[in-house]
Amino acid sequence: VLDAPTAADAMDLLTQTLRATGLTTELSRALVPWRKQFARHDPGKILTDLALMLAVGGDCLADVATLRAEPAVYGPVASDPTISRLLTALAADVDKAESAISTARRKARKNAWAEAGHHAPNANATAKNPLVIDLDATLVTAHSDKQSAAGNYKGGYGFHPMTAFIDHGPGATGEAGTILLRPGNAGSNTATDHITTTQQSLAQIPDLPPRPGRKILIRTDSAGATHDFLDYLHKQGWATR
């Protein structure tokens, strides 16, 4: 558990990261169609506030009050009803909203990797030193009824998202490429979900050539060892492990 000074420093680092990568700005541009004419709060700022809320340990929308209590650090934070209205508006056209948000994330990631220079995950990627994308499904417990929550194969209840993380190499961690939301009863070895997650994660890679070949390595556990998924990867010419 972080003490108060350490937590404050960590959150200051995150807010500076948002500014340095331009994520809030890119989201604001992408979400212009969802901004009301006389709105006080920007949709891009609202979404990054929700991300920060999760980083400080929140697990529901009401926990954004943690940020609202520190305006000197986080700036003006929208009220719960305003946040709820934005999410309702985004949910009215999920495909369009997800596409806009994904585009903003890709642009911000490009900014971040440009700043990282030769430390960026895609710097000097070769067949012998490929950019690695890790795929894995993970169980997320829901303690009460939620939209799309369902029983899972381990006897639990909740969600079963498929995740794709871009590996940062030896001695480092990684970053989320994409997370495919799925109900708890989704299969671990569903080939179509593996393919969709792979495609969405590759769409997040800045300046990726149309046929990167073995400069990309897709790494997964045995759940990804289905004929359909492996056939798809081999047709693309990507390395697998």
Predicted feature residues:
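Dynamic "connector" segments at or just before major functional cores
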Residues: 1-187, 192-211
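Conserved protein kinase catalytic core
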Residues: 142, 225-227
